Amino acid sequence: MAAISRLPEQGTLEQDQSKKINKEAEALINSSSYWDTDDLAAPHSIKDGKEASKWLEGYDEEARKVLQQVAVAAWNYFTAASPITKQHLTEAEDVARVFLKASAKQAQQFEASALEDPIEQKELNVISKEGLNALDAKTLARYNSLLGNINKIYTAVDVCESKEQKVCIQKYSDLISTIQINTDGPHALSIWKSWRSAVGQNLTEIYEKLVDVTNKAAKLNGHEDAGEMWRSAFDMIDAGKKEKMYDVAKATEAAYAKILPFYTQLHAYFRRQIAATYKSDESLVRDGPIPAHLLRSSTGDDWSAAYEETKPFDQMDKLPEEITDNLHKQTMKSRSMFVKVFRYMRYLGFEQLPDSFWKNSVFSRIWSKDMICNPATAYDMINGTDFRVKICAQIGQSDFVEAHKLFAQLYYKFLSSEQPFVLRDAPNPTISGAVAKAFGILATNVNYLKSQRLISPDAKLDQASLINELYHEALSSVVKMPFSLIADKWRYAVFEGKIGAANWSDEWWGLREKYQGVGAPKNTPEAQYDAVVAAEISQQHAPASRHIVEYVAQFQVLKALCAHSKTSLSEGCIPKKETIMRLIEVMKKGGTISWLDALEQITGTRELDAGPLVEYFGPLINWLSSTNEQDAVFLGWDGEGEKFKPEDIPRPRSENVADRPSIPSDDQIAYPGGNCAHGQECLLDTTCNGTICVCNAGLFTLQIGDTYNCVPDDPANAGFRDGSGLVIAITPNNQTKNGNSTDGDAASNEDSTTEPPKTSDSTRPALFSLLLLFAFVLSSVLMF
């Protein structure tokens, strides 16, 4: 990579940290009265509504200037990562923090109830929250340092796979890939113990300090503890008044109870299937919890690595390959694939996008730059006309589905752009995320795919393929629900001081066994560190409930969009235009309504309801129930520890590779760091280690974010060093929309049709919303 050798001439972050290079951002500091914190009035002492309204008007203009610098710097960094673009982003974020802290102090002077407009009241309340910025500079720096140290442990600590290993060079990322392909029980246990032994004690000490600092920030914001502060985004607690309009902890517990019968069937089937893989592991019994080290993931919140040897049916689904083939036959490129999806969105009733969308978006990887490809993300550049997406798309079903999700995210930003600046985008990121995921399911509907000539007119999704697809989804996502519930229950108890560090392990494993049916490996002292080594606990210092809310809500949104469809919910639908128009009206309101209002206006209920989720997985649930009954499988994990009998254990499976094409499609190739677990061919000087593409011997791995490159020289010598801080990926919200999309013109005449626009064979991200920016900068709730 030629750019490596030139980087030293440009300087490194270590050399330039004291020298400010983002002049545009620096010039904004103290450029108006909104940065001033001297001689402020007492909180809520200004009761003149007109004065408060005028202040909000000026704030709107100043905030745009500041956050536009963040948006531009973020775009430049994620599309062309380098020490220079990273420093530009860091400095823009630092300037934004100064502004947000100062403006929050100013906003606190005003009495919100003096404003006649309820939207202005909400606007003022959002701005006045300090969150973590309520900490003094020294304590805030300590908080950031603690997070940085946690990240260093995850990236820098060397771990042995076994006690016999003399030279330990494996990192956390190496262990993850090894765990996913490991089918040897003792070896899996050795890796499981080694990681916890290597980092557990250090992480425990750091996490205790992190809890203390986060609780201090919560109290400064009027909350009892950090758990209450985290929940406030969903509970909508007004600190001080203590009026709880919703109990998200109770709601997520109810959602778990609703899916528990399904989860129990899934757990029982999976436990029996992996017994064929781990026959010699006596810790796996037919009626008890599954030992955590046998789940093929670092924390046991994703079981999909065992999909191939446990899937219900051996046959392969041919539709993804057919979709990919037909996209190629239509001479599709990444950009034209997005044009195809955009025409569908236009058919459904969504508006034209500005010309800038097609001019400025990045649809495929730019190989001359070090792009950070993941996550694929929708951006609002804050200038009123510029909305973009960034994705390293490949032609195939996966990114065809991703395109639908990105458009849904982008339209939430675009359509709400006429709302006050801090109330643009969804009222809570879980709502926009749920809508986006629902559109991802719509993209797989057979009738829609036929209309796009992506599958043959007589193609059908057979029952076996559907059940396999639902099973894979359940292993990767449904099993996360109890783990996320546990993660928050445990942390809330820690924040509240109900359990001390000496009892952390007992509480953690009690919750894991009760809710997840997962147990600690026997006679392993290292298990005491299991909670703090979980990335969702220490690395992702934010409430896990947001995952449950978003995941459950996506099926509620899907059911609302498919209310008039005759197909099963599992198959998606082509929504009616009047249904989409109701969704569009909700999107236009942005954050001026609460997340519960948005949920109600989209789905018809203000409750988080897992019923549609259960309906969606209905075919799989019925199959699991029948199969488990036929095989006399024990349901639950509260048995006496009965061992599997030989006749209880199914035959081992092997992957069916008979029908792989000799020339791989885009879905069957992978790049450095990419997934090759299903036979993808590794490109660009890499070899498959069984799970991911790793650099060939003699090459160095350069990792920037989630993007990997294989280079001949040590990247550390070229200015790429492991930093101690977190890069905040910020995507601000929308503004006024102007201009028409030239690429979408062909879709504008399709609105009167009764089917999605047909095409001939010749037709060619948790980044954060603006509220997340305020959240991240202002509080841990911000971390939503």
Question: Could you tell me what each predicted segment is?
Answer:
Residues 248-259, 426-462:
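Post-HExxH zinc-binding segment in Zn-dependent metallohydrolases
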Residues 387-403:
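Short pre-active-site segment immediately N-terminal to the catalytic Zn-binding motif
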Residues 760-784:
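Cleavable C-terminal sorting propeptides in eukaryotic secreted/cell-surface proteins
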Residues 4-7, 11-208, 535-545, 592, ...:
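N-terminal helix-rich structural modules
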Residues 22-24, 34-52, 84-86, 235-240, ...:
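C-terminal, non-catalytic "cap/extension" segments appended to globular domains
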Residues 166-178, 209-390, 461-473, 479, ...:
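Active-site-proximal, well-structured secondary-structure segments within enzyme catalytic domains
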Residues 398-414, 433-437:
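Active-site recognition of the HExxH zinc-binding catalytic motif
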Residues 661-739, 743-744, 779:
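Conserved N-terminal segment of EGF-like repeats
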